[in-house]
Amino acid sequence: MAETNFNYSKLLRNLVTEDNVLNEVVVSFLYQLFPRDLFVRAFSLLESADMFIYVWMPTPKEADELLESLYNGTPLYRPIVRPRGPDDRPVCVDLDHWFCSCTEFAATCRPHLVGDTPLSDALFRPTEAADPDDCFGMLAGLQHLRADPEKLMCEHLFAFAILLQTDLRVLRHFSTGPGAQVFVLGITSIDEWLKLHLNVV
């Protein structure tokens, strides 16, 4: 199969079986598929209990409804990674615009900023469209993207994309039950939502 036709979402949604168990065969394959230990770092982040997804919901919802809305609805949400040290800052992720506030992601653009070529010319060119069913792989087919998608990826973007752009089953596996390691929190108060943006985002 040609790399341009590879459906990452279809593969990553098989990370968790129907019985809510990690599929070790898929985990091993993904380890080989992604470069420079990216999968290992993203998977470690998924198991770190440092990932939070804050969801704005003016009307309170049950926990399962809240998770389903992240796949079946269009809620306003903020994926955030808790700082690891006292001097660290929270990492904010925006999957819709493929942006992360971490230094690793910023470093991918830095060489283009110091060069003579404008950033838009350095990173963009016409490309073929991606498979419309492959939410996770859409980065590779963004109109005009020149840079290698793997270079515009960090562990935070990868981990949240695994949770939010593959299958609801994967999100449930990591965010529900006694062993939950990713926290999905609904916010119903506009004051609390604004405080989140002032204090974290």
Curated annotation (Swiss-Prot):
Entry's family note: Belongs to the SHU2 family.
Subcellular location: Nucleus
Entry GO terms, CC: nucleus
Gene giving rise to this polypeptide: SHU2
Biological function: Plays a role in a RAD51/RAD54-dependent homologous recombination repair (HRR) pathway to repair MMS-induced lesions during S-phase. Required for error-free repair of spontaneous and induced DNA lesions to protect the genome from mutation.
Domain of life of the source: Eukaryota
The protein, known as: Suppressor of hydroxyurea sensitivity protein 2
Keywords attached to this entry: DNA damage, DNA recombination, DNA repair, Nucleus
GO terms classed as biological process: DNA recombination; DNA repair
